[in-house]
Amino acid sequence: DTQNFSIKSDTLDVLNHIELEGSPENTAFRDFQRFMVTQNQKSKAIRDEYDKDPNKDKEEIKKAYTARFEQADKEVRAYIAQMVKKFPHSALATFANFTLSPEIPDFSKTVPENTKDREMEIRRQAYFYSKKHYWDYTNFADSTLIRTPIFKTKLDDYFKNMVMVHPDSLYLSCVEILE
């Protein structure tokens, strides 16, 4: 399949000045990158606001910030879902799906109120769920991602934050990924 397209940009600010012709998938990727920059700025602003809030330890304040973060996450997931629907089975869909982290259920609804160390149990269940589903959106048979910096970043994050640093745990996690 022959495709002709052109790319023009300012090398000092590629993302904001890139012009693409003849490649809807590349145009969608550029738009995705711009959207993610905006979303990351929005999330950082919420995080900064939370960090400076003198009432951040109050439960209702935490819930309000959590709702804002969840809304930002929903916007990203909706954007990616729309893009994947428009470009199914493409490198763009593979890449965009790879950026997603697992949607963790609200375990506070399933852990009984009278559970000893309830908050710890909720976090424990969330951790194990997240670890189990960390690679759900990853197709290891597709070599496209292996050549991207985001793959190394996600792999490093997995072994740094999801796997206990113990030879047996490291071994089992490596086997799970490779299989």
Task: Describe each region flagged by the PLM.
Residues 153, 157-161:
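Phospho-regulatory, Ser/Thr- and acidic-rich intrinsically disordered linkers and terminal tails
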Residues 89-102:
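Amphipathic alpha-helical repeat scaffolds of TPR domains
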Residues 72-79, 92, 170, 174:
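Stable alpha-helical elements in mature extracytoplasmic
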Residues 102-103, 177:
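A short structural micro-motif
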